[in-house]
From Swiss-Prot:
It comes from the Eukaryota. Residues 8-17, 151-163, 189-208, 324-351, 426-439, 607-619 have a biased composition (Polar residues). Interacts with tax-6. This is Calcineurin-interacting protein 2. Expressed in intestine. Residues 312-323, 688-705 have a biased composition (Low complexity). Residues 1-24, 115-169, 181-232, 310-351, 372-397, 426-708 are annotated as: Disordered. Coiled coil: none annotated. Residues 117-129, 526-538, 546-557 have a biased composition (Basic and acidic residues). Disruption phenotype: RNAi-mediated knockdown results in no obvious phenotype.
């Protein structure tokens, strides 16, 4: 992802040209951040509600939100690559560690409301002369209560020898930032390396690696042996954060709009991932057994408000985690299922999540109900059941038959048992029929069934329901928009054989009702021509299946686009002009007839004067003289030559007609028909052979030939007649 940018920055920061850097270019430093990152699986596996939660910007009350952090989101890219954003280049020299994890929690409302204590204790702080840098201990181990070490490990040169227990209680990190901001005004200026500073960098290189692994209940020296043990188990992403040094806001390098940014500082962050402490499945899989246990929980309790606190699943396993009083909102909490007794405590108190990390939001995946079906019964989030989960809920709920390959009956699933009949807006759009687990055969045929289904009349199903071997099409999935037939057909009265055996099965084996509707067996896939024009209506081919006694061609009225080769009825309607009726535009078939009769949309009926009607016509349908886009006043020469070519001696004065405004062509004609000076122009049809049309208008292009041709083309696309294929020889 960052490869291009690495090289770009490397070439930029070479020492060969130190002076032509941008004025704001700060010294890039190396920050280390520990994140216990539990992958949340590909984005598609989560229902949209949860994706929304993952995307949402955490809200916090403004007075407790550090101003630097407010706009930053920590996110995952779709590939589960974490984007850890660091506030800006202005603070690069100050930041040893940006986050106090507690601060992050307050900031996202995951944890306690911020404590007011430190604010009152502030005067004590003035005693310390040296600025204190905090390295926040990384995500503590499971059994450690979070509350003891609010302020992390103090790393001021004087304090570095202290063990954790001796720490004074200090304000959370962001308040210290605000103080530091006030203290040194020019934060951009890199500091001269003093002895303390060099000490600090050494400490950052050495000791920080230990600090990463501190189990915060132990003292800092105890953690050193733990380092080698952990190091092989975890992986590091070196993460480049690019900061726009003018605005001070971080940005994601991959985006196109940012590609040319010149004034960007690169901060290097090492993000350490430990494989999550409870193995991943435990953290985010919903397994069936647990869900059965929780089934009695009321649905309304499963819908936490977004801003509510989210308990991590592993809370109940750490007995030492400390309870704390909280506002009533978080009563709507699911007790974690390992320890049902937490139910009582949840109402009065809540436990701290013991594994806190910036990026980890997957508690929400555990606790927020997936709204797909509102009950908690759900099969494991795994590809198979997810597939059937998406497909079947709505299938069952709309009472549509689910054809399934009967032979694989053992693995079939009765979704009516697993899910209540509740359609969900998300799944109704994706109706797909779940295939039973192993059927690879079924994949090939879904296309056929899709094209067949749509064209099938509704009553067709009743014919062979009782035949001994029902022909069920193999289906991988119906087209995403369920066809009309599926919505309309009600399931037949008989129960499918698999339903009757339900008592013999343990409820964990889920089964699908096989509905024996007789579906038309798969013929050869119809070619687009067959679908479109009904061209090869070969009855012997269509009806060679027993029980299929209806002619199929009537069911294929598809005209998918404009049919290029017109069908019979097209040419028929073309030959009979209904010259006396005005048919409104919005009805396309009638519209076609109308356009043939009144070729010009300029002339409305009432404007045809008797003298005009008596004019000899070369054919029934005079061709429109296309001037849609021409300048409103055509030159006189063009007009005269037109009239000469038609042999019309005296231009007649048109009667006045009001033509509604919203049809621009007619409107223009209306304006022209009111100019007494200009004679009414009659279109010369194609029927006057081209050499009759005036030589003058042919010799030089008229007002706007190109534009006109474009409009001719538009006009032709609107009516679907053979004329489309003639070269456009209209006299222009």
């Amino acid at each position: 992802m960052n490869r291009g940018y690495d090289s770009y920055n490397r070439s930029r920061s070479t020492s060969s040209r130190p002076l032509d850097r941008e004025p704001y270019h700060a010294v890039s430093e190396l920050y280390t951040k520990e994140i216990t990152h539990t992958p949340i699986g590909p984005a598609s596996d989560l229902p949209p509600e949860i994706l929304d939660i993952l995307k949402e910007n955490p809200r916090a009350t403004p007075q407790y939100t550090p101003p630097l952090i407010r706009h930053r989101e920590n996110t995952w890219t779709p590939e589960n690559y974490p984007i850890v954003r660091v506030p800006s280049a202005q603070f690069t020299d100050v930041m040893t560690e940006l986050y106090d994890y507690h601060e992050v929690e307050k900031y996202t409302h995951r944890s306690v409301t911020p404590d007011y204590e430190p604010l009152r204790k502030e005067p004590e702080l003035k005693e310390q002369k040296l600025p204190t840098y905090q390295v926040i201990p990384p995500t503590p181990e499971k059994n450690t209560p979070r509350h003891q070490h609010h302020s992390g490990i103090t790393l001021s040169p004087s304090d570095s020898s202290r063990t954790l227990g001796a720490l004074p209680k200090k304000p959370p990190m962001y308040e210290e930032y605000l103080q530091m901001q006030k203290k040194d005004e020019n934060r951009n200026i890199p500091r001269q390396v003093s002895s303390a500073d060099s000490q600090r960098t050494i400490r950052n290189n050495n000791e920080l690696s230990h600090l990463r692994h501190i189990d915060s209940s132990s003292s800092s020296e105890a953690s050193e042996p733990a380092k080698d043990l952990d190091d092989r188990e975890r992986y590091v992403y070196t993460h480049d954060v690019y900061v726009d040094s003018t605005t001070g806001r971080p940005f994601t390098p991959g985006r196109e709009d940012v590609r040319e940014k010149k004034n960007c500082d690169k901060l290097k962050i090492n993000v350490y991932f430990k494989p999550p402490h409870p193995p991943v499945e435990i953290t985010y899989k919903l397994d069936e057994i647990e869900i059965e246990k929780n089934e009695n929980i009321v649905v309304t309790k499963l819908r936490p408000s977004r801003s509510d606190t989210i308990l991590s699943r592993s809370v109940s396993t750490s007995p030492s985690s400390v309870t704390d009083n909280i506002p009533k909102t978080s009563t709507s909490r699911i007790p974690s299922s390992e320890n049902p007794k937490t139910m009582e405590h949840t109402t009065t108190s809540r436990r701290f999540p013991t594994q806190t990390s910036i990026l980890r939001k997957e508690h929400e995946i555990v606790q927020v109900p997936l709204h797909r079906s509102q009950s908690l019964r759900q099969s494991r989030i795994s590809e198979h059941s997810k597939r059937s989960l998406g497909k079947t809920t709505s299938t069952v709920s709309t009472e549509r038959p689910i054809p399934i390959h009967v032979v694989e009956e053992t693995s079939s699933i009765d979704m009516d048992v697993v899910f209540p009949k509740m359609p969900h807006h998300q799944t109704v759009t994706n109706v797909r029929v779940p295939s039973s687990r192993g059927s690879a055969i079924s994949r090939a045929h879904s296309e056929h069934r899709r094209s067949i289904d749509r064209s099938e009349p509704r009553h067709h199903h009743r014919h062979h329901v009782h035949s001994e071997t029902p022909e069920l099409p193999y289906t991988r999935g119906i087209s995403k928009t369920p066809s009309v037939r599926e919505y309309n057909v009600k399931r037949e009265g008989q129960r499918s054989p698999s339903r009757s055996h339900r008592s013999e099965r343990s409820p964990s084996e889920v089964r699908i009702p096989v509905t024996t509707t007789h579906t038309r067996p798969i013929a050869k896939r119809q070619s687009p021509e067959e679908l479109d024009y009904g061209r090869f209506a070969d009855k012997s081919q269509q009806n060679r299946f027993p029980g299929d006694h209806q002619a199929r061609e009537e069911d294929l009225p598809y005209t998918r686009g404009i049919s290029k080769t017109p069908s019979n009825q097209d040419s028929r309607s073309e030959r009979t002009p209904c010259s006396d009726i005005h048919i409104p535009y919005n009805n396309p078939e009638k519209e076609r007839a109308y356009q043939q009769s009144e070729r010009s949309s300029y002339r409305s009926h009432k404007s045809v004067t008797p003298s005009e009607k008596s004019l000899p016509r070369n054919s029934e349908t005079p061709e429109l003289h296309y001037t849609r886009g021409i300048s409103k006043t055509p030159s006189d020469r063009v007009e005269k030559s037109r009239y000469l070519s038609r042999g019309v001696s005296t231009p007649h004065t048109p009667s006045e007609v009001h033509i509604p405004y919203n049809n621009p062509e007619k409107e223009r004609a209306y304006q022209q028909s009111h100019r007494p000076s200009s004679p009414k122009r009659r279109p010369s049809g194609r029927t006057n052979s081209p050499n009759k049309s005036s030589s003058s208008s042919k010799a030089r292009p008229s007002a706007a030939p190109l534009e006109e041709i474009v409009h001719i083309k538009e006009r032709y696309e609107r009516d679907e007649t053979i004329r489309r294929f003639f070269p456009t020889t209209t006299a222009v």
